Each structure stands twice: as C-alpha cells, then as structure tokens.
Amino acid sequence: METLSFEFPAGQPPKGRALVGVVGSGDLEVLLEPGQPGKLSIQVVTSVNGASLRWKHLFERMFDGQTPPALSIDIHDFGATPGVVRLRLEQGFEEIGHD
C-alpha cells in the first residue's frame, strides 16, 4: 500500500459532500468534502506501489485550464484504471454540484 498527496489551486469550497465508487474488484472509492478556500487537496491510498507519476499526470490533465472547487478528496484505490478514476471523480464533482 502506498499513500500519495497532491495539491492544486482551487476556487471556493462547495456546500455538498459526495461518496462515489466501491473499493474492491479493481475499483476505487472517492470521498469529496469541502476544503480550504483556494486549495484542492487529494490523498490517495493505493494498492499499486510506484504509481505516483501516473496519478500526478492524471490530476494535472483533469485540472489543466480550469479552477476546480476547493475540496479535500480522499481516494481509496484497489488498482483502478485511469479511466475509472476520472469517471469516479467526475461523478463526485457532479454530486457536489447538486444542492
């Protein structure tokens, strides 16, 4: 198991929270909670050691050219593919957008 941390510039925190996905069977769980204004913090606990660069590039592609909401995101990964990671994050962002 490996724990990774990432930070990105962000806007204001949302009001909502979201929990998407399920840990197990090659999937992941993503918990999104309001964070500190101006900062998006991501912590990844993954079963795949040595994948820090892959995670970094995935997040950079997702947030390039946009200002995400200020969130604290916890990801519990059990070997999910980058496509599944992005899908779950997008589901979480949509969830917190609904009041």
Swiss-Prot record:
Protein role: Subunit of malonate decarboxylase, it is an acyl carrier protein to which acetyl and malonyl thioester residues are bound via a 2'-(5''-phosphoribosyl)-3'-dephospho-CoA prosthetic group and turn over during the catalytic mechanism.
Database matches in NCBIfam families: malonate_delta, PRK01220.1
One GO term describing the cellular component: cytoplasm
Predominant location category: cytoplasm
Molecular function in Gene Ontology: acyl carrier activity
Family: Belongs to the MdcC family.
Keyword annotations from UniProtKB, A to Z: Cytoplasm, Phosphoprotein
Post-translational modification: Covalently binds the prosthetic group of malonate decarboxylase.
Protein name per Swiss-Prot or TrEMBL: Malonate decarboxylase acyl carrier protein
Pfam family, one: ACP
Segments forming a coiled coil: none
Cellular compartment(s): Cytoplasm
Residues found modified as O-(phosphoribosyl dephospho-coenzyme A)serine: 25
